[in-house]
């Protein structure tokens, strides 16, 4: 992901999650960045880039998956402390989490030719 796009997604994520983007030493900001990095790595892995792709081509391509990276980061951030749960019920509050794989809809891996 290119630096400008990364800065944009961080601001958007902070706005949605109510995190102060200027307090980069705050625990919630650090957690968000860790979840963003995890999401970027997951999309990279799902894309299965060929060896011919250099870092610039990968970064440019990842910009096309802004929405997937955004959704996956939100998913991972909101699952903090509830990893592995698919639903949660406490004091009359019911939560059902979507599947993590739904965040990968539209992420198409590169195919490899077997010789």
Language model regions located:
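Conserved short "hinge" loops at termini or chain/domain junctions
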Residues: 1-61, 103-115
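Short loop/turn elements at secondary-structure junctions
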Residues: 2, 57-115
């Amino acid at each position: 992901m290119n630096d400008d796009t990364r800065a944009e997604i961080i601001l958007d994520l902070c706005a949605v999650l109510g995190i102060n983007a200027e307090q980069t030493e705050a625990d919630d900001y650090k957690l968000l960045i860790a979840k963003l990095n995890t999401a970027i790595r997951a999309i990279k892995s799902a894309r299965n880039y060929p060896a011919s792709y250099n870092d610039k081509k990968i970064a440019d391509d990842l910009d096309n998956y802004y929405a997937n990276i955004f959704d996956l980061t939100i998913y991972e951030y909101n699952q903090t402390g509830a990893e592995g749960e698919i639903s949660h019920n406490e004091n009359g509050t019911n939560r059902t989490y979507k599947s993590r794989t739904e965040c990968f809809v539209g992420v198409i891996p590169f195919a490899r030719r077997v010789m």
